């Protein structure tokens, strides 16, 4: 069996739903080799709790039905992400509790956003380790109206241990349409500017986007429009609510002397000032 976790998922899913029948799913099976991993999510009861929350998710052989609900992910993929990350953080209950709350939330947008994070964690196991992460504090919303302007970053890294890591990461699972609205959304702008104020170099901030829902160049274009619209505000003195020239030079380049210099950089979406935008 190539992937026994997916096999377990399939059996449990069909067992719970009693809707879809498939060959080989006539009895419940828990593979012994996965006992330790399943223990990390609370064993069989934890598995059933997860599946109950994701009853609206598409299965692996459901073709395209329902794929957009969870950013193109199937129930098989999401369970595997959940179990693997739970096992990785089994000795950091402070971190796992936050992730578990998001993954099992009654809010579909929160679950989808958490799955975006889980998928990224699983793809990059050497980066997202219990030792590398200091704190997790996440709140995901479907629309810009749901944004939390005063919330902390989703992930704070311990980059004293690993200087190659950013200090903060923000996970955004928006689609193209939503990204196209950020330049005119006060909540998003307020949150973004507060994040810029919290770092001393742009390398310490990363926005991790969901590449299943938006192309990175589309997201860069959205930030380009935001920068153009907010340039004058960003150059205001900090006591007036801006970043100030010195902070902008720290973040985006010492060669910036005024708003015009900044906007010259903004015009090119391949300029390093956009390097804080990352794909999962």
Briefly describe each language-model feature range.
Residues 26-280:
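Catalytic toxin/effector domains delivered as secreted proteins or via bacterial secretion systems
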Residues 2-22:
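Classical Sec-dependent N-terminal signal peptides that target proteins to the secretory pathway
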